[in-house]
Amino acid sequence: MSEQALRLGTRRSKLAMAQSGQVADAVRQVTGRPVELVEITTYGDTSREHLAQIGGTGVFVTALRDALLRGEVDFAVHSLKDLPTAQPDELALAAVPVREDPRDVLVARDGLTFEELGAPSPKGTARVGTGSPRRMAQLNAYARSHGLAVETVPIRGNVDSRIGYVRSGELDGVVLAAAGLHRIGRIDEVTEFLPVDTVLPAPGQGALAIECAADNADLIAALAELDDPFTRAAVTAERSLLAALEAGCSAPVGALADLLADGQIVTEMRLRGVVGTTDGSTLVQLSTTGPVPETHDQAMALGRELAAEMLAKGAAGLMGEREH
């Protein structure tokens, strides 16, 4: 490869720039070439509507993919949970690096946990903000089953503005992704890491996707050095579940694949999935376990298998509008 700088397409948010900066450093190391960040504004960044209203699927991705297809950038970095499950033929998912913490976290007033926030008190119902129907469904279900007084409030905006709602007293707490706070150096503001048994994360949460043109074999080979096979297998299974449910990335679907080990030896992969009504009145939550997938097709099959079981239990009726 020549010494010409590689152009990395990124969203302009603080989080996206932090993620892309970390990937740029890694790509410089594996290629020996300079990498420059090219900032691109996406529809999801400029629209003030709630993601559930603007469709969710692909709103942060389309502009980056268009820039790739036009040859304005050489590769792009996405939050994998924002990536539509259908992969365009012209683009390759060249690398899925090692995943960050996939959990959701609570940032609450007075250092409180979710249970403490929702405990009956003279202050009345606790108001907890999130932009995600998936989080709303599971938080509301947990509150219902534990007798907590919690109202989930839809919010938008970047991490700073979301945490700002708590600091200003407008909300009692907000729920965010741990990985995002890690990447911008604000993890110390977390008041509780929410167990995945309480809130399953979004499919692919905490993972990054590095995409480039499918016909750029040299770049695909170089970027492949950043790929983590276990992370790729896990997120492939999670996203296969999402696709088989015919749900978009703003649907109330949670999924997490993790590896089960016997001592130091990884023996199986467990996939958990949940779908629910946003008021938390009904949840379908199931899991399946199988051999660790060794191919893309095996990982896809694990997701489809669990989706079929969830659909048989009535998952489709809980998602509102399904995508076609």
UniProtKB/Swiss-Prot annotation:
Location of S-(dipyrrolylmethanemethyl)cysteine modifications: 249
Family matches, as Gene3D superfamilies: Periplasmic binding protein-like II, Porphobilinogen deaminase, C-terminal domain
Cofactor: dipyrromethane
Gene Ontology CC terms, in alphabetical order: cytoplasm
Domain of life, per lineage: Bacteria
EC number assigned by the record: 2.5.1.61
Pfam assignment, any one: Porphobil_deamC
Cofactor details (free text): Binds 1 dipyrromethane group covalently.
Gene Ontology molecular function: hydroxymethylbilane synthase activity
This protein's UniProt keywords: Porphyrin biosynthesis, Transferase
Catalysed reaction, written as an equation: 4 porphobilinogen + H2O = hydroxymethylbilane + 4 NH4(+)
Coiled-coil segments on the chain, per record: none
GO BP terms, alphabetized: protoporphyrinogen IX biosynthetic process
Pathway membership: Porphyrin-containing compound metabolism; protoporphyrin-IX biosynthesis; coproporphyrinogen-III from 5-aminolevulinate: step 2/4
Similarity remark: Belongs to the HMBS family.
Known partners and oligomeric status: Monomer.
Note from the entry: The porphobilinogen subunits are added to the dipyrromethane group.
Role summary: Tetrapolymerization of the monopyrrole PBG into the hydroxymethylbilane pre-uroporphyrinogen in several discrete steps.
Name recorded for this polypeptide: Porphobilinogen deaminase 1
Species in which this protein is naturally found: Streptomyces avermitilis (strain ATCC 31267 / DSM 46492 / JCM 5070 / NBRC 14893 / NCIMB 12804 / NRRL 8165 / MA-4680)
